[in-house]
């Protein structure tokens, strides 16, 4: 799987720090899925998270408490 460019990723968020937080949160939720290994065999969760953010499949909300 080809990684999305940094320019595309940064166009989806307000800063690179928000991007890292959102990707980390999504990667953790992917890892918690018991079927992750079956559905995404050979893919790394952080790579999938960046891909979902670039394609607009993962929506998050930046709040005072963190990313939701």
Swiss-Prot record:
Catalytic activity: RNA(n) + a ribonucleoside 5'-triphosphate = RNA(n+1) + diphosphate
A GO biological-process term: DNA-templated transcription
The protein's Enzyme Commission number: 2.7.7.6
Coiled-coil segments: none
Keywords: DNA-directed RNA polymerase, Nucleotidyltransferase, Transcription, Transferase
Keyword Nucleotidyltransferase: yes
Domain of life: Bacteria
Statement: the UniProt record of this protein carries the keyword Nucleotidyltransferase: yes
A GO MF term: DNA binding
Enzyme class: transferase
Pfam families: RNA_pol_Rpb6
Entry's Gene Ontology cellular component terms: DNA-directed RNA polymerase complex
InterPro entries given in the database record: DNA-dir_RNA_pol_omega, Pol_omega/Rpo6/RPB6, RPB6/omega-like_sf
Summary of the function given for this chain in its UniProt record: Promotes RNA polymerase assembly. Latches the N- and C-terminal regions of the beta' subunit thereby facilitating its interaction with the beta and alpha subunits.
Subunit structure and binding partners: The RNAP catalytic core consists of 2 alpha, 1 beta, 1 beta' and 1 omega subunit. When a sigma factor is associated with the core the holoenzyme is formed, which can initiate transcription.
Family recorded in the similarity comment: Belongs to the RNA polymerase subunit omega family.
Name under which the protein is recorded: DNA-directed RNA polymerase subunit omega
Organism: Desulfitobacterium hafniense (strain Y51)
Gene, per the UniProt record: rpoZ
């Amino acid at each position: 799987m080809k990684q999305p460019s940094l320019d595309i990723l940064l166009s989806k968020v307000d800063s690179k720090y928000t991007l890292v937080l959102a990707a980390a949160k999504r990667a953790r939720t992917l890892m918690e899925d018991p079927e992750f290994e079956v559905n995404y065999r050979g893919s790394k969760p952080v790579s999938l998270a960046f891909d979902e953010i670039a394609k607009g499949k993962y929506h998050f909300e930046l709040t005072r408490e963190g990313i939701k």
